[in-house]
Amino acid sequence: MPFIHIRMFPRPQEVKKALAEELTKIISKHCKITDDHTWIVFEDVQKEHWSMGGKLQG
């Protein structure tokens, strides 16, 4: 059973819903499994807790 953990800046629920639907379709197709076997968790991380290129984002 695939488990996808996505950490990202906070996004609206509509965005997470669309991502979950599309990612589930892709995983199901390529792994030849039914949609209910794909798990996705979204973890919102505030910008001030991210660093990219050595610079804090918040």
Predicted regions and their residues:
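A domain-level signal for the structural core that forms small-molecule/cofactor-binding pockets
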Residues: P2-G58
